[in-house]
């Protein structure tokens, strides 16, 4: 039984109540009683609106299901389909042209194009690493990944391999030549660096060279005659060449260069949503406490590496001498967003006894806005606790709001933020919103969604996986869908990605707000990422998601190769897609799959589902590197789970597979997943006692009940089964 404290109509879990009163409120100048009174009023006033929005989702889905069932034999008529969606209020009229008016936004969001990290807030070590990933070693990123081949004696090995190291140095020199070129010379031939009359001078064997563009020299450390580092700038991003002839690497380098540091994760999303498993008050407080530590600047974590233990803390800002003297200070940490949960889920960390509620758990999205907003106040202040470790330098709080369906839900978020600002005593407009364009009704009405948040919006971002999950679920009754791997090459996906950029640019995002694109999930395949992910900045995106600090450093190279703001200028005013393209349902044209192809698809998805769900349910891990059926490590979160479970639910609904096929595949894949996790002492095997494994049953639920889940979301089943496991463990 949860110990609770009454606060007006609310009963708050004591662990949350004490955390807020004893840790989050001190230092904010907010009175405890007035805060809880404000929480009570916001929850009581806004809960009915939240409920109405969810009812609208269900009503629209029911009408779409019915329409598809009635036309099941006929081919889909695009005009009739479009008219039907308009008639029921799913497809809305686009507003007149407008320009967003958001103000007080940091440069990292408005005028800097670069990588964006997303990390689970429940893991303090990951959160610290991400916040510190503003700067990363290019040498380390190259040496430790497959970007540099292990052929011809260049294996990683245990100790330093000079053959591999030389390949890294050559790669980095080429990057410098491409990004910050010298006039008539190459960094490969450099023998030293110095500063003369505010200009960079690079010594060569018999002569010297200057930068082709002297304006790219941004500063240095050490002395002008003997600098310890050289700071360069390109496309708004910084590159730092570290010089130390006494170091292991520098001693072998003609110019004494020991590393090249890239400005990497410009922004980071601290995630309370798809990458975490937070099902009760204890889980929520763990996340809130880590968010508090990041904002106060005192989050720390003991880390053991090579038998040595040290304490990891947040990096301080970086100071340089400007080219002509004076001091230049650059941020040492990534600018932090926080992703709240969406409008769907409730959490019994707080229950409400307001009229009609009868002890019902409170909507988690309302809670997150209140508590992450309160905590973020610490990141706006310079105090004894955090020194100068503030987050926003413009006084803004950045909240990513996921899984919104259409402009009414965006407007509700803005009303919620406004009410929270009143409770916290913050100026209206302090809490900015990042809109995830990951639900079909938002994609189709994106212009109206942006307009609903025109004075708060700081980013729009495509999320291919969730968006595909909603694509499948919305058209669940239309017929069987194509295979998961084929989804990326469909007409609607290209239209979706292009429309997001076009709509953002038309609303004045360039130079004012981020246009973002999705995650690279193959965490070990960095050579492929370096080759392919450049497509995102080339498409006009000022940011794109990466799964690790190393990936952020490697992806940063793309923003040196591509001037995103120049790309946006070329795209400005273009409309490259139509509503009909966005409405093209990815149905299989004919069921021409061989039995072995169907089995392969089902096994692949069942393995993916089990590999993620078993750690979610049994260990409370919401973001995992899960080996796929071919043992390729993939970064999985609830978005990947949604698409896998919805595809199988769709095939089940249309008789491509039976429930017996799904169960048989789960039983085939569970031993493989058990084997893949054999090295984890915390792991509990699912085979052979499948029906005793709550995780196995959760995976089965997600497939067999997938068609009935609200919008195909996985959270209701995951939360219920995780709480069941916690109850069993505590019994």
UniProtKB/Swiss-Prot annotation:
Which cofactors are reported in the record for this sequence? Mg(2+)
Question: Residues that bind glyoxylate, according to the entry?
Answer: 339, 438, 463-466
Among the GO biological process terms of this entry, one is: tricarboxylic acid cycle
User: Where the protein is mainly located, per its record?
Assistant: cytoplasm
Gene Ontology cellular component? Answer: cytosol
Q: Which residues form the active site?
A: 339 (proton acceptor), 637 (proton donor)
Report the enzyme's class at the first EC level: transferase
Cysteine sulfenic acid (-SOH) PTM positions: 623
The name on file for this protein is Malate synthase G
Species source reads Mycobacterium marinum (strain ATCC BAA-535 / M)
Encoded by which gene? glcB
């Amino acid at each position: 039984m949860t110990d609770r404290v009454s606060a007006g109509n609310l009963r708050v879990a004591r662990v949350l109540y004490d955390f807020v009163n004893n840790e989050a409120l001190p230092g904010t100048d907010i009175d405890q009683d007035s805060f809880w009174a404000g929480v009570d009023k916001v929850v009581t006033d806004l809960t009915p609106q939240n409920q109405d929005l969810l009812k609208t989702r269900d009503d629209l889905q029911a009408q779409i299901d019915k329409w598809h069932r009635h036309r099941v034999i006929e081919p889909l008529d695009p005009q009739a389909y479009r008219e039907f969606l308009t008639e029921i209020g799913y497809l809305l009229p686009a507003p007149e042209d407008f320009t967003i008016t958001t103000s007080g936004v940091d440069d990292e969001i408005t005028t800097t194009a670069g990588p964006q990290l997303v990390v689970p807030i429940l893991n303090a070590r990951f959160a610290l690493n991400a916040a510190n990933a503003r700067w990363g070693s290019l040498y380390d990123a190259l040496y430790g990944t497959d970007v540099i081949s292990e052929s011809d004696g260049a294996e990683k090995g245990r100790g330093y391999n000079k053959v591999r190291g030389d390949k890294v140095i050559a790669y980095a020199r080429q990057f410098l030549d491409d990004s910050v070129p010298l006039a008539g010379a190459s960094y490969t031939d450099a023998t030293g660096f110095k500063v003369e009359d505010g200009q960079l001078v690079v010594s060569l064997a018999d002569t010297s060279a200057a930068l082709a563009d002297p304006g790219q020299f941004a500063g240095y450390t050490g002395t002008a005659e003997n600098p310890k580092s050289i700071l360069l700038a390109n496309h708004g991003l910084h590159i730092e060449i570290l010089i130390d002839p006494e170091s292991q690497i520098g001693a072998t380098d003609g110019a004494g260069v020991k590393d090249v540091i890239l400005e990497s994760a410009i922004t980071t999303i601290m995630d309370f949503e798809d990458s975490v498993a937070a099902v009760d008050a204890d889980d929520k407080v763990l996340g809130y406490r880590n968010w508090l530590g990041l904002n106060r600047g005192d989050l720390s974590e003991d880390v053991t590496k090579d038998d040595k233990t040290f304490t990891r803390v947040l990096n301080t800002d970086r100071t340089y001498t400007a080219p002509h003297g004076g001091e230049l200070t650059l941020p040492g940490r990534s600018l932090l967003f926080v992703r709240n949960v969406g409008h769907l889920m409730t959490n019994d960390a707080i229950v409400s006894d307001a009229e009609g509620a009868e002890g019902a758990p409170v909507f988690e999205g309302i809670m997150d806005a209140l508590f992450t907003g309160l905590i973020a106040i610490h990141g706006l202040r310079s105090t004894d606790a955090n020194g100068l470790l503030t987050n926003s330098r413009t006084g803004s709080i950045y909240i990513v709001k996921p899984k919104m369906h259409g402009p009414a839900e965006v407007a509700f978020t803005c009303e919620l933020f406004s009410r929270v600002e009143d409770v916290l005593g913050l100026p209206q407009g302090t809490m900015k919103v990042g809109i995830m364009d990951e639900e079909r009704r938002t994609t189709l009405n994106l212009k109206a969604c942006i307009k609903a948040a025109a004075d708060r919006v700081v980013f729009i971002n495509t999320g291919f996986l969730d968006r595909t999950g909603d694509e499948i679920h919305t058209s669940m009754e239309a017929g069987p869908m194509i295979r998961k791997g084929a989804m990326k090459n469909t007409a609607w996906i290209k239209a979706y990605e292009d429309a997001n950029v076009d709509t953002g640019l038309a609303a004045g995002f360039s130079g004012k707000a981020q246009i973002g694109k999705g995650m690279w999930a193959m965490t070990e395949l960095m050579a492929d990422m370096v080759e392919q992910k450049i497509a995102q900045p080339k498409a006009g995106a000022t940011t794109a998601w990466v799964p690790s600090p190393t990936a952020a450093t490697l992806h940063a190279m793309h923003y040196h190769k591509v001037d995103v703001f120049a790309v946006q200028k070329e795209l400005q005013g273009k409309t490259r897609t139509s509503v009909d393209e966005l409405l093209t349902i990815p149905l299989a044209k004919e069921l021409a799959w061989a039995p072995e192809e169907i089995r392969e698809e089902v096994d692949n998805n069942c393995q993916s589902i089990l590999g993620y769900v078993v750690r979610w349910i049994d260990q409370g891990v919401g973001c995992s590197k899960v080996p796929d059926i071919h043992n390729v490590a993939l970064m999985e979160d609830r978005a990947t789970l949604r698409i896998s479970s919805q595809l199988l639910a769709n095939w089940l609904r249309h008789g491509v597979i039976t429930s017996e096929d799904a169960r048989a595949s789960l039983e085939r894949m569970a031993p493989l997943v058990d084997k893949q996790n054999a090295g984890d002492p915390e792991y509990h095997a699912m085979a052979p006692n499948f029906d005793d494994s709550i995780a196995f049953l959760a995976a089965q639920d997600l497939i067999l009940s997938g068609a009935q889940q609200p919008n195909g979301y996985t959270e209701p089943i995951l939360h219920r089964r995780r709480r069941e496991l916690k109850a069993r463990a505590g019994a």
